[in-house]
Amino acid sequence: NSKSLLDGSLDTRVYTDNANVSRVNVSDYVNPGKYEINIKTAATKATDTATDVGINSTGTGAIGASGTISINGSSVDIDANDTMSEVYEKIRAAAEVGEAEMKTDDGTFTGLQASRYGSSAALVITFSGKEGVSTTKDFATALGYTTDLTTDAKTGTMTYDAAKAGNSGTDAEVELSVGKVIAGTTDTSIFSNTATVATDGNRVTITDRDGFSMSFL
């Protein structure tokens, strides 16, 4: 609501009993009444589902290969003398800058997932081994990536093929009850037949009638 709270002029209040809805924004043109919005499918993140990926976060042994790994555009250099735990921390830090996050299991690095939800979520991982120290394949293998990699013939850079070993992010799917009795009540939804829904990740925006808008995530 765009009206000031200080002078007590707020006339539109929105309540939710769903702890997973963190914020609801409504325009000044929303009419008081019953609204029913059903989340059919929750938004998801892009995820790395490769097998045989695991760097022990407390390992003291040297990784044995050097190169550069890029996670969603955030690059970090890894030295052959870095311990597994040091490599783990470097990858974790790069992932955070690259809008990704570690997926851990029993203290080991088991993969990455995008920080954002929805179809715009990205998870692009590339490996580039340093010449004379290790091949790019050796470097990627040392980091635990042994499958589902494609190589650029010109640069030798290997890209994690998310299409083969990952799940793309998806937007939420919602359903509006238009002119129907809401379950368990005698009230009907006051959405009109022209109500439309737009989703962007886990953000849902509903427009209906002139000036009406409702957005939540």
State what each model feature region is.
Residues K3-L217:
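Bacterial flagellar/type III secretion structural subunits and associated motility module proteins
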